[in-house]
């Protein structure tokens, strides 16, 4: 029998976008063929999909890392790189996706429901797409962007119409076994059931599922025992059925006190899906009380005595024996009617594909703050500047010049001047720090040089901080000029 795993931490990594290509078309009798480097392919996404044949999160327990494939690099002759293949991860029906802070990102209910857990990075532009009047044959291309990488928490909440609640050894597993064809483990000791058991029950034209939730004890809502793990599985149940052991010999226990204790735990528990399950709060769910083990004479007398008091709360009461199968028929009909009424009031939604929307590409806002670690330095933050930094190959002067032009058009250079930045000041954007120098914008009269170079970068011959310090010490006579 396979292990039942209902909570895992999954690390997902989308594919990286492929780099663009910088190439020039070469053909006989065409000395000026022009740029023909194509764009890189997009990285693959990581997608969670509900599959009817998957019933546990066991695979993710043993394989907690999932990575999609990268996009391919572009090539010459305008051959675009292939996109990375999406990674499809199959999850069971009822999987809830949360971030590491416990916020619900997606509630996957219904076969075919999808959630884009991580989006692949965009491919870099090739030099054919970067050609302009100022750069007719760019000697550079843009790098592909990294894909989204994040940690997700997957929790499985059983998708059942009726949840059977009760203390350990109340006979819940026995009831599931006689109502359906399920064969749960049954034994005469507490906590025999450690995972929810699902059974399919047919009553006339109605078919519904019953979940045997492992036994609850006082303090379960605060995590005592395995309470939180057990209570999680009742969040989707439309009907809550209290299974009461009328034959218990435990001191201080009776049907009324057991019901009160179970209701106290339900009232204290805060479901993660309270607003998203569509079923309302737990205290508003329909209730039914099942007085079990009435094949024992003393239990039958006790059940008859407490029935009026329970019915006074407005809950239907059924007296049964899972062993002798007495009273099962009216119970099955009643549960079927309650489920049928719920389904009519709550039509089943169509499976939805839930997607994480990336930040808008047209977001041109940015901020500039003084660098607390470097005197006279500045830190630039913004969606576009940080993306452009990641796309730039800094071993290519022409690519660096293109980056400078983009930042200038965005207004970063003017904003640095207004902030008091001096030539040679340290500027940090993303993970890159550099000495800032005002540059002349590239125009159509830009001096032609070799591909991959930018003459504007050669015009700066500013001495560094160490050289300035050395010059001051020479002027003061502290060092020889040749030292």
Swiss-Prot record:
Gene Ontology cellular component annotations, sorted alphabetically:
cytoplasm
Cofactor(s) the record lists = Mg(2+)
Q: Where is the OBG-type G domain?
A: 160-340
Q: What class of enzyme is it?
A: hydrolase
Q: Where in the cell is it found?
A: Cytoplasm
* EC number(s) given by UniProt: 3.6.5.-
Q: Where is the OCT domain?
A: 358-438
Span of the secretion signal? none
Q: Which residues bind Mg(2+)?
A: 173, 193
Q: Which UniProt keywords apply?
A: Cytoplasm, GTP-binding, Hydrolase, Magnesium, Metal-binding, Nucleotide-binding
Q: In what residue span(s) does the Obg domain sit? A: 2-159
The residues that the entry says bind GTP are 166-173, 191-195, 212-215, 292-295, 321-323
Top-rank taxon, per record: Bacteria
The main location is: cytoplasm
Q: Name one GO molecular function term.
A: GTP binding
Supply one GO BP term: ribosome biogenesis
- Describe the function of this protein: An essential GTPase which binds GTP, GDP and possibly (p)ppGpp with moderate affinity, with high nucleotide exchange rates and a fairly low GTP hydrolysis rate. Plays a role in control of the cell cycle, stress response, ribosome biogenesis and in those bacteria that undergo differentiation, in morphogenesis control.
Output the HAMAP family linked to this UniProt entry: GTPase_Obg
- Quaternary structure note: Monomer.
Give the UniProt family note.
Belongs to the TRAFAC class OBG-HflX-like GTPase superfamily. OBG GTPase family.
Query: PANTHER family, from UniProt?
Result: DEVELOPMENTALLY REGULATED GTP-BINDING PROTEIN-RELATED (PTHR11702), MITOCHONDRIAL RIBOSOME-ASSOCIATED GTPASE 2 (PTHR11702:SF31)
Name used for this protein in its record: GTPase Obg
Q: Tell me which species this is from.
A: Rhodococcus erythropolis (strain PR4 / NBRC 100887)
